[in-house]
A protein has these predicted regions:
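Short, small-residue alpha-helix embedded
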Residues: 145, 220-243
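Conserved N-terminal subdomain of the carbohydrate kinase-like
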Residues: 1-105, 109-117, 275-280
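Fold-independent oxyanion-binding glycine-rich loops
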Residues: 8-10, 37, 78-79, 106-108, ...
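Phosphate-handling active-site elements
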Residues: 209-211, 236-250
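Short pre-catalytic strand/loop immediately N-terminal to key active-site residues, enriched for Gly-Thr
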Residues: 12, 210-224
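Charged C-terminal helix
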Residues: 244-282
Length: 282
């Protein structure tokens, strides 16, 4: 059985991070091996939450797993509470990332033009270093702009332009040029205005190809959708699917869950009821 290390936080509410990744990777027929970066009562979008930082415990996982002699077919990292955790992940990669290991980094920094509470310049610089090691990164547009030091407002002001996706593609190539491995960047949650209505799309860019897939935009955002997307992508690529196949699978899976959550008026911080759609990933 293939094995994926999941480096992310564990939140009691919000259906995100590890509570999203573990069921997705498991249902896709792989062993999910969680390495928690923090344990929270609820994800940080809630008005109140308690966070137990795991920075000083992360190395225990690395060292104990080394003693077991285990290997990983995939490594997926997400939320980091500070730059110190990024150094722990870099150490983990040194120990466990082999030539055949797929590493996916989700550079959790912000959304909708705003940075998250944990953001700092030190965290950003660390994330820039971390993403150079990844075969796949899955930023949203805000995170892509932060990583490329691009003004988000200037980019988003072009979303009615015909060349909007080309502008985003150009930013991706700026990052790819700095990567230490062959890299694919998948930009998530790109909202575009079309005559038939607003759509939300995901854009995959590599040196070899560009691929874009979209679905109707409900106008609402939900906790954990980026984590679910990254988890499906990671699982699909580790299983040997192509980038296009992985993108299609992740997009269609999320579309159903998001449309239902919108119909049911589920508060965004609680995430989507993805569990009933896990069979789509078999």
């Amino acid at each position: 059985m293939k094995r994926v290390a999941l480096i992310n936080d564990l939140s009691g509410f919000g259906k995100c991070s590890l509570t999203a990744a573990i069921p997705v990777i498991s249902v896709m027929g792989m062993q999910a091996c969680p390495l928690p970066t923090a344990i929270l009562t609820a994800q940080t979008g809630f008005s109140s939450y308690y966070c137990d930082d795991y920075t000083d415990k992360m190395d225990y996982f690395t060292e104990e797993w080394k003693k077991l002699g285990v290997t990983f077919d995939g490594i997926y990292s997400g939320f980091m509470s500070d730059a110190g955790q990024i150094q722990k992940v870099l150490h983990f990669l040194q120990e466990f990332k082999k030539e055949t290991t797929l590493y996916l980094a989700d550079p959790v920094l912000g959304d909708h033009g705003q940075t998250y509470d944990v953001f700092s310049e030190e965290l950003l610089q660390g994330m820039k270093e971390l993403t150079t090691q990844a075969e796949v990164i899955t930023p949203n547009l805000t995170e892509l702009c932060l990583l490329t030091e691009t003004d988000y407002g200037e980019v988003i002001s072009c979303k009615k332009n015909a060349n909007y996706l080309k502008i985003i593609e150009g930013l991706c190539h700026k990052l790819i040029a700095k990567a230490e491995v062959g890299q694919t960047i998948m930009v998530t949650g790109i909202v575009r205005q079309k005559e038939t209505g607003d759509v939300v799309g995901n854009l995959a860019v590599s040196e070899k190809e560009t691929y874009y897939v979209e679905s109707p935009y409900t106008g609402k955002g939900f906790s954990g959708t980026g984590d679910l997307f990254a988890s499906v992508i990671c699982g699909s690529l580790v299983k040997g699917l192509s980038v296009r196949e992985a993108m299609d699978k992740a997009t269609h899976f999320l579309q159903e869950a998001i449309e239902e959550a919108s119909r049911e008026n589920i508060p965004g911080v609680h995430g989507v009821n993805f569990e009933k759609y896990l069979s789509r990933l078999l």
